[in-house]
C-alpha cells in the first residue's frame, strides 16, 4: 500500500512534513518523500494528517467485560490474595470485549493491559494490538511489567484481612522481594544439582524477571508519599520502575527528575473519587514534560473509555502542555514506557504500519478519524 500526499506527524520530529508512506507486509518501508509508481494499492490522503497509532500505556481493556454489571464481570483483580505476582494479565483478556473496537475507532492501536490495583502485587501486564480473535494473535509482549500498588486501593480491599496502613503495603512488597531474591540466589547456587534447588514456587519465579531488571515494577501510585515509597523500594532492590497515575507528580518534580523514572499520568477525565485524587490536574503532564521527564498520558480504561485518549492529550494541551509533547505522550513515550518502541509509537521505516489518518488534529474534539491502519490493514474506514 502507498499512502499518498499526507501531512506526516511522525512523533519524532516536532514539525510535520508532506509526503508519501509506503507499506509492505505490514511494515513501514519509507516515510516521507515521493514514492515511486508501483503496482500497489494507493490511498490518496490529500488533506489528511498521518499519525502513529496511539498507544495507551495503562488500561484494563479486555479484562473488564464492557457492559456487564459493575463488580460482577471484571477479571482484573484477584480479591483473595494480596500478593499474587504469578498471575498473567493475558489469561483474563477477552478479545471480543465490546470496548476493543471502540478504542480502535478512536485511533488507539496498541495498549498495555493487565491486573488492577487491589493487590500489593497483582501480576504481569502485557502489550497487545486492538484487533483479532484471540490475545495470542496480536500480542506484542507477554510481560511488560509487574503490577504493584500503593495507597488507598490495597488498604480498602484488604483492610479486614491483612493491610490497613501504607507502611503495611510497603512491608509486604519488601518481604516478597527479599524472599524472591533469596529464592533466586539459592536457585542459581544449585546450578544443575536439582537436589539443592529450592522447591518450585510460582510467585518467586514471577519476580525473578523484576530482580534481573528484565521488566519493571509497574507501580500504581497517586499521592506524592506513595510515589516516593515506590521509588525508595525500587532503589533498595536495584529494580526498574515506572510510576502509574502519578497524580501528585507535579508536587515532587525535582525528586522525580532525580530518580529519572518514566511516568504515566491519568486518568484525569474523572471525578476525585477518593482522597488521593484531590490534587489531580490537567496541568500535571505538561509540568512533568517541561521538566524533562518521559511522560505518557493514560486512560486507565475502563475508567476513561480508551477512545478518549487523544482527547485527554488535548485537554493537557489546553492546560498548557506543549502540543508536540502531548502527541508524544500518546505515541512514542507510552511505547517506550512499556518497552515496545521498536515496533510502535512513531512513523519510522522498519516499524509496524500502524497509522491514523485524520481530518484535523486528533487532540481537538471536532477532528474526524478517517482511517485506522494496523499492521498495514485498514481496520477502520470512514467516508
Task: Describe the residue ranges of each PLM region.
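Divalent metal-coordination and catalytic microenvironments
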Residues: 6, 21, 26, 47, ...
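N-terminal metal-binding scaffold of metallo-dependent hydrolase/deaminase domains
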Residues: 1-39, 48-50, 361, 377
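Polyanionic/metal-chelating signatures
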Residues: 104-228, 232-241
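C-terminal cap of metal-dependent C-N hydrolases
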Residues: 4-10, 336, 348-383
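Active-site gating loops and adjacent loop-to-helix segments of metal-dependent hydrolytic enzymes
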Residues: 68-93, 134, 149-154, 196-197, ...
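Active-site core of metal-dependent hydrolases
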Residues: 72, 89, 184-281, 296, ...
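His/Asp/Glu-enriched, well-ordered alpha-helical/loop segment
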Residues: 66-67, 71-80, 84-86, 216, ...
Amino acid at each position: 500500500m502507498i499512502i499518498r500526499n499526507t501531512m506526516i506527524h511522525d512523533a519524532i520530529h516536532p514539525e510535520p512534513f508532506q509526503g508519501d508512506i509506503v507499506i509492505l507486509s505490514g511494515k513501514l518501508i519509507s516515510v516521507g518523500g515521493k514514492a515511486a509508481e508501483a503496482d500497489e494499492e494507493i490511498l490518496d490522503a490529500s488533506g489528511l494528517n498521518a499519525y502513529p497509532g496511539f498507544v495507551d500505556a495503562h488500561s484494563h481493556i479486555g479484562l473488564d467485560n464492557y457492559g456487564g454489571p459493575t463488580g460482577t464481570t471484571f477479571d482484573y483483580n484477584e480479591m483473595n490474595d494480596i500478593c499474587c505476582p504469578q498471575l498473567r494479565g493475558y489469561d483474563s483478556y477477552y478479545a471480543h470485549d465490546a470496548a476493543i473496537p471502540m478504542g480502535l475507532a478512536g485511533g488507539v492501536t496498541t495498549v498495555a493491559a493487565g491486573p488492577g490495583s487491589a493487590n500489593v502485587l497483582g501480576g504481569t501486564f502485557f502489550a497487545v494490538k486492538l484487533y483479532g480473535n484471540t490475545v495470542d494473535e496480536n500480542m506484542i509482549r507477554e510481560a511488560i511489567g509487574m503490577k504493584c500498588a500503593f495507597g488507598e486501593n490495597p488498604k480498602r480491599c484488604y483492610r479486614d484481612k491483612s493491610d490497613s496502613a501504607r507502611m503495611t503495603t510497603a512491608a509486604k512488597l519488601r518481604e516478597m522481594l527479599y524472599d524472591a531474591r533469596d529464592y533466586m540466589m539459592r536457585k542459581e547456587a544449585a546450578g544443575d544439582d536439582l537436589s539443592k534447588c529450592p522447591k518450585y514456587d510460582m510467585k518467586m519465579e514471577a519476580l525473578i524477571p523484576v530482580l534481573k531488571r528484565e521488566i519493571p515494577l509497574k507501580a500504581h501510585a497517586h499521592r506524592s508519599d506513595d510515589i516516593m515509597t515506590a521509588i525508595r523500594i525500587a532503589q533498595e532492590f536495584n529494580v526498574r520502575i515506572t510510576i502509574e497515575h502519578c497524580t501528585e507528580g507535579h508536587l515532587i518534580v525535582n525528586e522525580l527528575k532525580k530518580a529519572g523514572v518514566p511516568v504515566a499520568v491519568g486518568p484525569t477525565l474523572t471525578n476525585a473519587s477518593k482522597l488521593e485524587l484531590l490534587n489531580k490536574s490537567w496541568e500535571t503532564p505538561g509540568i512533568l514534560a517541561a521538566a524533562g521527564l518521559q511522560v505518557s498520558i493514560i486512560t486507565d480504561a475502563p475508567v476513561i473509555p480508551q477512545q478518549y485518549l487523544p482527547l485527554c492529550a488535548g485537554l493537557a494541551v489546553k492546560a498548557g502542555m506543549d502540543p508536540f509533547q502531548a502527541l508524544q505522550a500518546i505515541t512514542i513515550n507510552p511505547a517506550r514506557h512499556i518497552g515496545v518502541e521498536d515496533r510502535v509509537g512513531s512513523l519510522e521505516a522498519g516499524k509496524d504500519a500502524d497509522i491514523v489518518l485524520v481530518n484535523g488534529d486528533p487532540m481537538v474534539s471536532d477532528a474526524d478519524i478517517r482511517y485506522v491502519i494496523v499492521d498495514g490493514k485498514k481496520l477502520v474506514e470512514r467516508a
